[in-house]
Amino acid sequence: QRALDGLDIEGRLVIYSGNAPERYDAVRFEQFMRSPTLAVDGAYARLTPDTVAKYMMTSGSTGEPKAVINLHGMVASNARMIRSIWDEDRLDELTGGTQVMCNFLPWSHTYGAHSILHNMLDWGGTLYIDQGAPTPARLPEMLRNLKEVSTTQHTTVPAAWAALATELERDDQLAEVFFKRLVCMAYGGASMGQDIYERIQAVAVRITGERISLSAGYGATETAPTASNVHWPNDRMGLIGPPLPGNTFKMVPNAEKM
């Protein structure tokens, strides 16, 4: 109910499963699925891998923001590429077959809209939308949500990891809930300092007795988004990993960089 109250959905129809929401026009999911409509069937039948799924704006880090055409085939194949690097049997063993994430990354950016949303859809997991953020005003909400939801994966930006590291070090209750089911951590959007990594792992070892993989990768809005990934336990930040299955990289000299 709190999640719905935080959205501007007055006058919108809410489709629900479980407890009926308060104060909204709502229909149960089972009833919704039993209501036939040829329009939906027709629209679905016209979808192909080359059908445009969305126009995603770039962040402007390399110039003026521009609209990137993301096709259904792009976003679907990228989600499957990422899934292919997991040991699914081992993951199911660790998580009980249920993926859970609590995330604040906006769907107006490829990281949240693709790497988070589409991957959780592909897993058939549960995504809790976090109204918090790593800012002074919204950090308390982010921490409260992470105390309520014990996630199996946590992916966010370095600024959030920096804030979270401090709170994990001083709040044992938060640390216990955060690491209770966690099997994988990841960061993206910017580089992350080695010191932040070491602080997070120190808490992980104190709570669980072992380190938990904290990975990163390389991608862009145009690649929808992940092109490479570090998908093994690692102790060094700043790596991008090898290309995901189906991708090919070409290294091009650029001044003192590759």
Which positions does each model-derived feature cover?
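Active-site "substrate specificity/gating" loop of NAD(P)-dependent dehydrogenases
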Residues: 67, 75, 113
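Structural detector for helix-capping/boundary residues
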Residues: 27-30, 50, 72-73, 105, ...
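Conserved pre-ATP/AMP-binding loop-to-beta segment of ANL
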Residues: 15, 33-57, 64, 89-100
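Conserved adenylate-forming
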Residues: 4-24, 95-97, 116, 123, ...
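Conserved helix-loop functional segments at active or binding sites
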Residues: 34-38, 81-91, 170, 206
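ATP phosphate-binding P-loop of adenylate-forming
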Residues: 50-68, 79, 83-86, 218
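Conserved AMP-binding
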Residues: 83, 104-110, 117, 133
